[in-house]
Every structure is written in C-alpha cells, then in structure tokens.
Amino acid sequence: MESILFIAIAFLINSFISYKITNMQPKIKSRIFKRVKMHYLNLIEGKKAEFDKKAMPILFGFMIIALISFNILLYVVYNCPVSITSIIAEILIIISMIIIWKAFNKEISVYLCDDGIYYSNKFISWKNIENVKKDDGFIVLFGKKKKILGRKLYLLQRIYLKYDEEIENIIKNQIEKFRDKA
C-alpha cells in the first residue's frame, strides 16, 4: 500500500510544477503590440473549453466521492482496516486535483509582440504559424506540423485568441512580414 503513497506524492509534485508553469510570466524580448487577457483553457481549446470549465469541478467532485466511497466500502463490506498511508495518499491526490484545477482555471495575459506570441512560459514565433482562421468568436492560429519520432505522426499546435479586428490585423500583418523575410 506504500506504493500508492509514492504515486500520490509524484502526482502532487507534478501538480505543483503545472501550477508553477502556468503562473510564470513570459520574458518578452521585443516590442508589445497588444496584451490580451484570456482564460487559459480557452487559449488551448477555444469554444470547447466552456464545457470543460463547467464539467471539470463536477468530475473532480465525483472522483473524490468515489475515492472516499471505495474506502468506506472496503471497511464495511470486507472488514479491511484502512491504513493511514492510504488515507494520506487520498488526501494528497485530492489536494493535487485542486491544485491542477486552480492552475488551469484562470485568466492569463497573452502578448502579441514584434517577434511572436508570448504567454505563460511559452513563445510562438510568427514564422511558425502556418494558417489563421476565424472560428466561433475566436481567432485560431495553426502552427506548422512537426514530425514525432521521425514517423508519419504529426503534432499540430494551435492556439485560440478572442476575436477582435485589431488582433486579427496585427496577426495577419506580422505573419506577412515574416513570410516576406523568408
């Protein structure tokens, strides 16, 4: 049963790292055109994040209730005493889920700069953006396809920004500027 405690500690460390990464401020190296405040989940998923923002706390609640119910079931049905390590592991897992939810359920600043887009600890250069599309009140920026492990699998990066004409004009002008340089 001690192995579950190690897993819970690893999960807790992972959630702290995720929280720390999402709270990092970017080190901007060029002129800022526009700063956009945006929800982190919307930046990653666009309109689909609206469902996630509502469903995630409910899902975490069900998982916590299931975890506690499982221990009660073990104790009542099988007369199996619940060890202190399993209780500590459950508490650490619950704390980890709360930390992860706090990390992803917040607004962050996205900076449209002269050389690319900065947010959290990430930087996306204008030359790495392949396509721009308007979709459901968002501007979708598609990154260039990257091969994974030299195979036929590709990783397609995309981010979503709130639709605004000024933002759209900045993005299109910068992409054209970087395409002309190449």
From Swiss-Prot:
Q: Which UniProt keywords apply?
A: Cell membrane, Membrane, Transmembrane, Transmembrane helix
InterPro entries from the entry?
Answer: DUF986
GO cellular component terms, alphabetically, are:
plasma membrane
Provide the primary localization: membrane
Q: Which residue windows are transmembrane per the record?
A: 58-78, 81-101
* Pfam families the UniProt entry points to: DUF986
According to Swiss-Prot or TrEMBL, what is its membrane topology? Multi-pass membrane protein
Q: Where in the cell is it found?
A: Cell membrane
UniProt keyword Transcription regulation, yes or no? no
What family classification does the UniProt entry report for this protein? Answer: To M.jannaschii MJ0803.
**This protein's name:** Uncharacterized protein MJ0696
Species of the source: Methanocaldococcus jannaschii (strain ATCC 43067 / DSM 2661 / JAL-1 / JCM 10045 / NBRC 100440)
